[in-house]
Amino acid sequence: MSAPSVPIGPGSVSGAPNLPSGFTDTFTSRFIDAGDVRLHAVVGGDGPSLLLIHGWPGSWYYWRLVMPSLARDFRVVAVDQRGIGLSDKPEEGYDTRTLANDLVRLMDALGDEQFAVVGVDTGMLIGYALAADHPDRVARVALGEAPLPGITPPNPLVLPDQVVDRLWHIPFNQLKETNEKLVQGREDIFYGAEFSASAGTNKLPEYAVKYYVDGLASSPEALHGSFQLYRAFGATSAQNVERMTRRLPMPVLAMGGAESVGAMAADTMKLTADDVQTLVIPDVGHWLAEQAPDELVAALTEFLAPYLEASPRAAVATAS
């Protein structure tokens, strides 16, 4: 039996808990063919398109608290990356060049020649690749809460305890098989510890952590897919070294939580672009859209205002 054309149940909008009031009046889950993969995206709103790229170990659901406000001005597209959520999980194709190409094909299918991008955590890696490899397609890009392999200066081998708690998963996730064998059946311990350590003092609600963990534990394929981007870090690092030969032409907003990476994303993005604005949100850990949705919306609204004002689609939406 083929999968339904409209996603339903766990992983989709219809199966997501504790959504903001009126969310399902604006947003729907869609399966979209993007070349050799079918991606799941949650789409809604009017105006120029805004692509939201989640991080690890999240999904489109990470953005749920900011999506309704952003949808007042933009058509919001919150995607599950290749290997994540309801999107296809092939064995290959997890370097950021391939992942960025997936998203270009996704936006092609939605009819968008140009769009803005927001990416956090591993979504920062993909968002940077998207902006660097397809600068004609990306009007503005907001990225945060991650190092860029091959660009961000490497950390020393011996790190402070609080840094180890936040970042030990990066080399662990790159293992070929051992990580899956250790985590399978213990997803709540592994991923639960990751959510807790990276959140800082303002922990995520239990229902959200449970939703993410249940999705990752739902099948061996889901668990496997969650590690694949990390296993491709070697290829991504080499690609980033080549990308560094070209400066990003579009404005960049570099974001961080004060209890997490702070201004590290800005320091990294200044190595790749000339027009870089810095946002550090006080009293917030790694999960910006979960922990400070109002502050994030305000910053994105200001940063994206020139993109909105220049868009013909915004004028049509306002007139209607």
Short names for language-model regions:
Residues 2-30, 36-39, 49, 77, ...:
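Flexible "cap/lid" subdomain of the alpha/beta-hydrolase fold that forms the substrate-access gate
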Residues 42-86, 269:
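Conserved HGGG/HGGXW glycine-rich cap/lid loop of the alpha/beta-hydrolase fold
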Residues 59-60, 125, 285:
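A short, glycine- and basic residue-enriched loop/turn
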Residues 315-320:
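A short, charged, Gly/Pro-tolerant segment at domain boundaries
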